[in-house]
Amino acid sequence: MVIAGFLLLRTKVANAVECGLKCGQRSACASFAVEYSDSPGSKLCELNTVKAKSHPESVVRKKGFQYYDQAEVFY
């Protein structure tokens, strides 16, 4: 699934961990979706400015994508 209308950045990554790191590097990023596939190579990573639970009306099922909320980490 993805969140329509709140895209911050669309980029290519090697895996979900890299997509999550890109989200963590941007203060405006609240969640991300990454393309999943068994084939090697780059995958599409979409960073969002909101979380699905705050905008459920904008959640769209998109085949081949896995959604993640950005973890809140305090140092």
Model-derived regions, located:
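Extracellular disulfide-rich cysteine clusters
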Residues: 1-75
